[in-house]
Curated annotation (Swiss-Prot):
GO terms for cellular component: cytosolic large ribosomal subunit. This is Large ribosomal subunit protein uL30. SUPFAM superfamilies: Ribosomal protein L30p/L7e. The lineage of its organism: Bacteria, Pseudomonadati, Thermodesulfobacteriota, Desulfobacteria, Desulfobacterales. Part of the 50S ribosomal subunit. Belongs to the universal ribosomal protein uL30 family. Keywords: Ribonucleoprotein, Ribosomal protein.
Length: 59
């Protein structure tokens, strides 16, 4: 069974570059304080790294 990580959007997407918004939408984060549970894969880790200043991560 793969590991899961919880990602929460803690800062708004307003006035952020389009690339950051697309990454957040790709992870399923659309509203402030929304939490999603994702599989811990290198792809997801890369997405989290791009928007690390906007999200909170719990393993």
């Amino acid at each position: 069974m793969k590991q899961k990580i919880k990602v929460t959007l803690v800062k708004s997407m307003i006035a952020r570059p389009e690339k950051h918004r697309k990454v957040l939408r790709g992870m399923g984060l659309t509203k402030l304080n929304k939490t999603v549970e994702l599989e811990d894969t290198p792809c997801i880790r890369g997405m989290i790294h791009k928007v690390s200043h906007l999200v909170s991560v719990k393993e």
